């Protein structure tokens, strides 16, 4: 049954001065709130390796943020902002980034009322010869509200990934209330980012340095990666009074066969780095159920966890995914998920969560509340009273699931 949750019950007072507008000089110098067995304490993030018990499994999201925000101008001078969401032709990320000369993307279009037809040209306010030679143009193929299908074309034989590097800016969150700057190119990206495709960083990972990860490994924790490309929906507020009226956007994810086997075999407590890793890991059960019942894994729907009781164990669901890949000689599961995690969710894989402090009345606050119960209020009250910095560039927390 879809939970009837009033989003107003998950609000807290966050003033502008508590939002971190810029990262700290050192990634691992942020504060770390630790919640365990109902107790809340304050540490420093670089102490995380000594806090984590050994013998566990830590899962990161190794997606990479792309400079997906582009500014074009009509011949009339009207500025059109185009925010690339996901590739359409070619539909695979790797092929789309390698495309030369032309490609199509699903985009959010700013000032779309002013763009009915005809090509628009990339703005070049500083007269860059590189931008001039590239001659990047965009045509709106079809429109659906604020989103649309946009065809990009350019010269010079460059791959589209290079086009974005030259022409695009990092799409930092709107609540920072500033334009992206050179510091964001490095710091709004995890040190282990690998696969291009996100329009928002998995911000829990921003605190990790290679040294931190190395120390965690040395403490006996296995390190593994999933990849979920974070979509623009991560910035969308919940506008409906009840969470049942909120629509989650599809986000593509992938996970290696070896990690599926590790999760199935168990014996290690799982620490997820960030809510995107959580949503990927907890989607696996429902993909496995689809595999058991239909013979193949389907994208995970928003309300799959709440629609009915499932008779299968987590091991059975993971087994089904493993067999599906093995039968096809494949080593990576690639799917999409719209899963929403709210109070009442049945946890199957994740035991601990590293996460930042999220916006009031957001789906991410609901995920935290599902993880720690009503203690989410104590956690946030503590963070507010002790001067923690909030949101993407803010401080972090290590939460142990309430069992």
Where are these regions (language model features)?
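Surface-exposed, charge/polar-rich loops and edge strands
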Residues: 1-403
């Amino acid at each position: 049954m879809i939970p009837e949750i009033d989003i107003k019950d998950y609000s807290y007072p966050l003033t502008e001065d508590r939002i971190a507008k810029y990262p700290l000089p050192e990634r691992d110098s942020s504060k770390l709130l630790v919640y365990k067995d109902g107790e809340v304490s304050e540490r420093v993030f670089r102490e995380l390796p000594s806090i984590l018990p050994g013998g566990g499994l830590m899962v990161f999201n190794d997606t990479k943020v792309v400079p997906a925000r582009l500014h074009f101008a009509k011949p009339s001078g009207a500025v059109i902002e185009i925010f690339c969401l996901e590739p359409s032709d070619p539909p695979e990320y790797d092929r789309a980034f390698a495309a030369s000369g032309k490609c199509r993307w699903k985009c959010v279009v700013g000032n779309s009322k002013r763009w009915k037809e005809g090509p628009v040209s990339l703005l070049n306010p500083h007269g860059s010869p590189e931008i001039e030679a590239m001659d990047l143009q965009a045509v709106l193929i079809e429109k659906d509200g604020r989103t649309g299908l946009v065809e990009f074309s350019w010269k010079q034989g460059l791959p589209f990934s290079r086009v974005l590097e030259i022409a695009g800016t990092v799409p930092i969150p709107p609540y920072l209330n500033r334009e992206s700057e050179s510091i964001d190119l490095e710091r709004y990206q995890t040190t282990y980012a690998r696969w291009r495709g996100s329009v928002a960083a998995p911000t829990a990972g921003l605190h990790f340095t290679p040294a931190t990860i190395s120390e965690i490994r040395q403490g006996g924790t296995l390190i593994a990666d999933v990849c979920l490309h974070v979509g623009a929906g991560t910035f969308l507020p919940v506008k409906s009074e009840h969470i049942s009226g909120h629509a989650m956007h599809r986000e593509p994810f992938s996970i290696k066969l070896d990690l599926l086997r590790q999760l199935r075999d168990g014996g290690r407590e799982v620490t997820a780095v960030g809510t995107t890793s959580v949503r990927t890991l907890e989607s696996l059960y429902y993909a496995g159920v689809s595999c058991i019942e239909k013979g193949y894994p389907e994208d995970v729907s928003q309300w799959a966890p709440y629609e009915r009781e499932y008779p299968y164990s987590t091991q059975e669901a993971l087994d089904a995914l493993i067999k599906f890949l093995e039968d096809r000689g494949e080593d990576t599961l690639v799917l999409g998920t719209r899963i929403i995690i709210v109070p009442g969710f049945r946890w199957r894989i994740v035991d601990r969560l590293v996460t930042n402090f999220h916006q009031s009345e957001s789906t991410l606050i609901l995920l935290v509340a599902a993880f720690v119960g009503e203690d989410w209020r104590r956690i946030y009250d503590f963070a507010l009273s002790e001067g923690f910095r909030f949101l993407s560039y803010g401080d972090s927390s290590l939460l142990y699931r309430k069992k």
